[in-house]
């Protein structure tokens, strides 16, 4: 497989065309952003950790029946993925009160929720990725009811699998954001799963091991990402 021209560069990744139909190459960067790009910086080694961690988790999810865009890890930073049409919805699952959820509802951070919550946000940085419901998504033509049902089912399954997996390495899955795409009329998990897209706390100390360390200027960002990577035991 040959890497061809760059198709897109986002906040955390570059995407390249290949000489294979319906296959792209994703190149993970060390760039870090927060608050819809208002805060910018660099987390040394983040690209390697996010690439390898995301691939590792997606392979586990495939075993549990969640289809993903993952094809093959090409290098520490590059992965071959299926070319999908991204559904313009960010899907957020929350298990514990944190971040904007806690602030918006006036709930203390760290409060265990009685059940996981599912949110949709409209993917548009210029609007601040506003929260919408399934009726909005259908009315705007972002997704059909069948697609929304499939996305919701997969999102809860991802949560179920990851909660157990992270608990096994002493990490609590607070919340996470995922994205889905259309691939030959099938809905599959796309984008990434990493400390950029998940809130991960040490179960015993509640130390934050995710991008909140960058957002909130807590320091030791690289160490936190590396700690998650090491606990996963990725070789």
UniProtKB/Swiss-Prot annotation:
Molecular function per GO: ATP binding; phosphoribosylaminoimidazolesuccinocarboxamide synthase activity
Keywords: ATP-binding, Ligase, Nucleotide-binding, Purine biosynthesis
Record pathway: Purine metabolism; IMP biosynthesis via de novo pathway; 5-amino-1-(5-phospho-D-ribosyl)imidazole-4-carboxamide from 5-amino-1-(5-phospho-D-ribosyl)imidazole-4-carboxylate: step 1/2
Pfam families: SAICAR_synt
EC number: 6.3.2.6
Reaction equations catalysed: 5-amino-1-(5-phospho-D-ribosyl)imidazole-4-carboxylate + L-aspartate + ATP = (2S)-2-[5-amino-1-(5-phospho-beta-D-ribosyl)imidazole-4-carboxamido]succinate + ADP + phosphate + 2 H(+)
InterPro entries: SAICAR_synt/ADE2_N, SAICAR_synt_PurC, SAICAR_synth, SAICAR_synthetase, SAICAR_synthetase_CS
One GO term (biological process): 'de novo' IMP biosynthetic process
Top-level EC class: ligase
PROSITE patterns: SAICAR_SYNTHETASE_1 (PS01057), SAICAR_SYNTHETASE_2 (PS01058)
Family the entry assigns: Belongs to the SAICAR synthetase family.
HAMAP family (UniProt xref): SAICAR_synth
The protein's name in its UniProt record: Phosphoribosylaminoimidazole-succinocarboxamide synthase
Organism field: Lachnoclostridium phytofermentans (strain ATCC 700394 / DSM 18823 / ISDg)
